[in-house]
Amino acid sequence: MIIPAIDLIEGQVVRLYQGDYKQKTTFDLSPLSQLKSYQDQGASWLHIVDLTGAKDPDKRQTNLIADLVDGLDANIQVGGGIRSEAQVIELLDIGVKRVVIGSLAVKETALVQSWFEKYGAEAICLALDVNIDEQGEKIVAVSGWQSGGGKTLESLVEAFKPYGLKHALVTDISRDGTLQGANTQLYREIASSYPQIKWQASGGIASLDDVAAVRDSGANGIIIGKALLIENFNVEQAITCWPNS
């Protein structure tokens, strides 16, 4: 499944290079028009990252996200520094279909497990952003990739499996924003180890060949941001390559 994505800072569509706010590209685009275009080309899910909220929880772009949800028919998945149950409730209340939880799942695992029990596994996607070390260990990073969480991807999956974990978004940090292609080996490994989880791949997608490679890796979906913004290909072409199921 193709999941087009936009990142937002203070209402503007941006892309960061490897999560670095200092390496930001701003696009002169209306968030709603851009997402509508993706939807009109056939996307049934859209991914929004609130980078302002990720940096400062007091400045979450909830009103903008509510307007985007209201203006779109596609299902919306939202991430970016979600740190409290109140924020989860707020997003679900405005019509967001799935919230993406990253650092908190590492730092406060029991708290996030309780959200799975309250809101159901369909409403939560774990974001597992990994640095792969020399031994091949998949170490999950936290706090906008500024620090290592010390937990492996597998240990977190095992912690959430009893709570019905269904959706997980995995980014190889070294590929993010680079347009160097996805780490398909990573997705092959996790999809074969945990076939019951719907894996979303993210990071490095530059071409339709990359989309096809991720499709063939066993991942269930692919988050595409920068490649669509710089028009390497469009959503319609991507869906032709990997039809939504």
Curated annotation (Swiss-Prot):
UniProt pathway: Amino-acid biosynthesis; L-histidine biosynthesis; L-histidine from 5-phospho-alpha-D-ribose 1-diphosphate: step 4/9
Enzyme active site: 7, 129
TM spans (from-to): none
Record field: catalytic activity: 1-(5-phospho-beta-D-ribosyl)-5-[(5-phospho-beta-D-ribosylamino)methylideneamino]imidazole-4-carboxamide = 5-[(5-phospho-1-deoxy-D-ribulos-1-ylimino)methylamino]-1-(5-phospho-beta-D-ribosyl)imidazole-4-carboxamide
BP GO annotations: L-histidine biosynthetic process; L-tryptophan biosynthetic process
Pfam families tied to this protein: His_biosynth (PF00977)
GO cellular component terms, semicolon-separated: cytoplasm
EC number: 5.3.1.16
KW Amino-acid biosynthesis (keyword) present: yes
A molecular function (GO) term: 1-(5-phosphoribosyl)-5-[(5-phosphoribosylamino)methylideneamino]imidazole-4-carboxamide isomerase activity
Keyword Transcription in annotation: no
Protein keywords: Amino-acid biosynthesis, Cytoplasm, Histidine biosynthesis, Isomerase
Subcellular location: Cytoplasm
InterPro entries hit by this protein: Aldolase_TIM, His_biosynth, HisA_bact_arch, Isoase_HisA-like, Isoase_HisA-like_bact, RibuloseP-bd_barrel
Disulfide cysteine pairs (residue numbers): none
HAMAP family: HisA
Family per similarity comment: Belongs to the HisA/HisF family.
Protein name, entry field: 1-(5-phosphoribosyl)-5-[(5-phosphoribosylamino)methylideneamino] imidazole-4-carboxamide isomerase
Organism annotation: Shewanella woodyi (strain ATCC 51908 / MS32)
